[in-house]
Amino acid sequence: MPAVPADRPMHAVRIWLAIIAGLIAVMVLVGGATRLTESGLSIVEWKPITGTLPPLSVEQWTQAFDAYKTIPQYRELNAGMTLAQFKTIFWWEWSHRLLGRVIGAAFLLPFLWFLWRGDLGGGLKRRLWIIFGLGALQGAVGWWMVASGLSQRVEVSQVRLATHLVLALLIFAGIVWTLRQLTPRPAIVAPLRLRLTAAVLLGLTFVQLYLGALVAGLRAGRIYNTWPQIDGALIPSAARLWFEQPWWKNLFDNHLTVQFDHRMLAYALWALAVLHAIDAWRARAAAGGALALAVAITLQAALGIVTLLYAVPIGLGLAHQAMAILVLTLAVLQLARFSPGVVQTAQHAAAPSLGQPAQGRG
């Protein structure tokens, strides 16, 4: 029997969202390279429209370089930098911002087209508007992050950097979740504990991504480059972990505490992922997804250790970030397996709204 014509719009929507997810993943990696190459403050202005074009003449390049020379990073870290060296860091930041503009256009224009055609159901339409709003917010958060390094600091705030990264990956996860739900299939029948552990794994993955961004922002991966010991012990002394006052500042500013937290949560994530895989295998429910997630977290932990031991060279740092995106994707998909997939075209009058349970086992 031929495919139902009403499903054709959803096929186009799925392709579109998959492209957007891929572009976001690329942008996150370019952002990681921008951070690792210390390029994020090379453009000291935020011009959403006119900033699309890079400098096109010697005079424009000189103006951009002179603007960079006014900030503390140049004066304290890069004094004596040549114009050729400046161009290298400029292109990283400019590429990162350009990708943001491309993603915005690639999301908005097809979205408006689908809205005009009436292809999107109410639930999907609302969700996509939320995703678009988060994307617009992300641009503002990016400038908020950059602004933190323009007056008194020689780098951006690690807290703002972590916020910027996690928001990008929250948007990415929302798109992946939506893609999975747009694939028409029933939810997997599974014990409640499997659903709960899948949800906890996803939540802890986001916390770990935040901690990883703090490590990157503080350059904390370039110190304490031993494993399994850190600062000469398996568990550092409380005096070293909590010396800043008030105590909670250590969670964000203390290099030792931030790296230690990142390590400890990695161990907890790995243990929970393995237990989840064993439980899923015994319950015969989403066992393949659980195993894939456990393997990915195992590989990510091993890669993180190697990256630490080599003091975060750019190649290993980017590989670690790419693997983190894969872990997040698998964690989202694993939780989504316990939620129903639905078709969301306006023509599917009989289809449940996005997020409404469907019956069946798969």
UniProtKB/Swiss-Prot annotation:
EC number: 1.17.99.9
Gene Ontology biological process terms in this record: heme A biosynthetic process
Paired cysteines (S-S): none
Organism superkingdom: Bacteria
Pfam families per UniProt: COX15-CtaA
Entry GO MF terms: metal ion binding; oxidoreductase activity, acting on NAD(P)H, heme protein as acceptor
Sections of the chain in a coiled coil: none
Pathway: Porphyrin-containing compound metabolism; heme A biosynthesis; heme A from heme O: step 1/1
Subcellular location per the Swiss-Prot or TrEMBL entry: Cell membrane
Cofactor: heme b
Membrane disposition: Multi-pass membrane protein
Cellular component GO terms held in the UniProt record: plasma membrane
Keyword line: Cell membrane, Heme biosynthesis, Iron, Membrane, Metal-binding, Oxidoreductase, Transmembrane, Transmembrane helix
InterPro entries per the UniProt record, alphabetical: COX15/CtaA_fam, HemeA_Synthase_type2
Record: residues binding heme: H262, H320
Chain ranges passing through the membrane: 12-32, 102-122, 128-148, 159-179, 198-218, 264-281, 289-309, 312-332
Catalysed reaction, written as an equation: Fe(II)-heme o + 2 A + H2O = Fe(II)-heme a + 2 AH2
Statement: the UniProt record of this protein carries the keyword Membrane: yes
Subunit comment: Interacts with CtaB.
Biological function: Catalyzes the conversion of heme O to heme A by two successive hydroxylations of the methyl group at C8. The first hydroxylation forms heme I, the second hydroxylation results in an unstable dihydroxymethyl group, which spontaneously dehydrates, resulting in the formyl group of heme A.
The family this protein is said to belong to: Belongs to the COX15/CtaA family. Type 2 subfamily.
Name of the protein: Heme A synthase
Recorded name of the encoding gene: ctaA
